[in-house]
């Protein structure tokens, strides 16, 4: 019998706010444990939450990016459960009136994955297990960090579709300025709800939830493993238990964590300390008007205007920084082809050599365009351009100033170049004779000797012209 896998995803993204959703503690990643906390996010008695309006605005922006409808009034609810990383013993979330509903993401195949809703909530803390101390430690820095939970419908049927959905959703959230979606820092986390059923059947099977997925590769492996596990159980006549499972990517297997709760288990009720959130149509339109260009529109513009290949476009769209760098570089140098080549080939090489990631890059995006102009005008050669670009990327150097200070500009003094060529010809009479006898390889040898004599500070085209004139 053939089986169909049915997948729905719950994706949590951290919103790009400076402070937490209900207090003024910073959201910065990587602080010393339990230093970004206050009585509000620790849930101490007598404290009251104050809603961060920036979190609401970013959530509306996310909803608009995915084509959601924005609720004119939404509200918060308390989700009650006990866990060590949740000091209040409840999480402020949205169940009954979420902010955004009925959006979608379209895959390359044309298939639409529906988004049921997006709702705001606060993050919990983080548990860290210390084998040396034989203790589990709690870091509450993450408590109260604003999250947007994006809940899809169960519209995906393979690991590949689920990963593509995650990639497109991440791209959408990053380019709309909602979240940096860095999985390694936990600012994008995905829970997988999965069931299997005989092909052609409409009734859904018993689902499990998979957690601890810290990369798209882990998500793909976990989906394939869980689908195979459930099919094996069905074929053996065993019952699938509705449960939450933890994925161990190193071992390539999942383990039961706890029985899967239903909504009723959390005893939701309206949050009494936060009034309903009203969003006027005028505010929604203001946010829409200030939205950055979204990925689909940017891809279409590049391919229509610059005739970029899909491969080049995909690489340039790997981060908002490289996309902006391409647009700014093209505007300065006028050549989309040159801009794409430097960003897609030279930039990764520089980053690798410096042990940096694209997130570490922090240079003036116009610098590359100015550098390409210097190369095109003959002020520097390509080898020098590569050296200067490395300094631009790693030290935010200004190309023209760096070239001037380090004497890297090409010689433009025709007399000096011709003097060097004459010396080379006098020292290599045999090669000169070979060239005059029709051996073209000798000419290339002479160009190399001239370039060496000039210390590489002349263009090969200028040297070739002088050599032809004097030989």
Residue ranges, per PLM feature:
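Amphipathic alpha-helical core segments of compact helical bundles
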Residues: 16, 193, 197, 228, ...
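Basic, nucleic-acid-interacting segments
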Residues: 1-293, 304, 308-310, 331-335
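Strongly charged, low-complexity linkers/loops
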Residues: 358-369, 373, 382-452
């Amino acid at each position: 019998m053939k089986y169909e896998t049915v997948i729905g995803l719950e994706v949590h993204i951290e919103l790009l706010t400076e402070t937490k959703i209900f207090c003024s503690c910073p959201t910065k990643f990587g602080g010393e444990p339990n230093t970004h906390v206050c009585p509000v996010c620790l849930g101490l008695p007598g404290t009251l939450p104050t809603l961060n309006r920036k979190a609401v605005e970013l959530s509306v922006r996310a909803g608009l990016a995915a084509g959601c409808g924005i609720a004119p009034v939404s509200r918060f609810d308390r989700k009650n459960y006990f866990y060590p990383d949740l000091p209040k013993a409840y999480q402020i979330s949205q169940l009954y009136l979420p902010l955004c509903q009925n959006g979608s993401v379209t895959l390359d195949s044309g298939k639409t994955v529906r988004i049921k809703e997006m709702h705001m909530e606060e993050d919990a803390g983080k548990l860290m297990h210390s084998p040396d101390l034989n203790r589990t430690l709690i870091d509450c820095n993450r408590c109260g960090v604003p999250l947007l939970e994006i809940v899809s419908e169960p519209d995906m049927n393979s690991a590949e579709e689920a990963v593509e959905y995650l990639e497109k959703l991440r791209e959408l959230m990053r380019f709309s300025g909602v979240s940096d979606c860095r999985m390694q820092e936990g600012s994008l986390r995905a829970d997988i709800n999965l069931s299997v059923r005989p092909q052609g059947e409409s009734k859904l099977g018993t689902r499990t939830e998979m957690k601890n997925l810290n990369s798209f590769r882990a998500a793909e492996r976990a989906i394939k493993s869980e689908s195979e596990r459930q099919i094996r159980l069905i074929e053996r006549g065993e019952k699938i238990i509705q449960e939450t499972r933890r994925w161990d990517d190193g071992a390539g297997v999942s383990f039961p964590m706890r029985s899967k709760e239903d909504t009723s288990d959390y005893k939701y009720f309206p949050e009494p300390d936060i009034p309903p959130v009203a969003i006027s149509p005028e505010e929604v339109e203001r946010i829409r008007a200030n939205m950055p260009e979204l990925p689909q529109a940017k891809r279409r513009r590049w391919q229509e205007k610059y005739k970029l290949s899909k491969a080049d476009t995909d690489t340039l769209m790997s981060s908002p920084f490289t996309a902006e760098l391409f647009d700014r570089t093209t505007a300065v140098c006028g050549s989309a082809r040159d801009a794409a080549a430097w960003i897609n080939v030279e930039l990764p090489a520089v980053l690798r050599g410096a042990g940096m990631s694209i997130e570490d890059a922090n240079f003036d995006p116009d610098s590359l365009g100015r550098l390409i102009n210097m190369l095109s005008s003959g002020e520097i050669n390509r080898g020098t351009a590569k050296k200067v670009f490395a300094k631009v990327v790693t030290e935010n150097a200004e190309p023209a100033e760096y070239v001037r200070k380090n004497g890297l500009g090409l010689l433009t003094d025709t007399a000096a170049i011709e003097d060097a060529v004459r010396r080379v010809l006098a020292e290599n009479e045999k090669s000169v004779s070979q060239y005059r006898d029709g051996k073209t390889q000798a000419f290339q040898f002479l160009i190399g000797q001239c370039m060496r004599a000039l210390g590489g500070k002349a263009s090969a085209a200028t040297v070739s012209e002088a050599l032809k004139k004097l030989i």
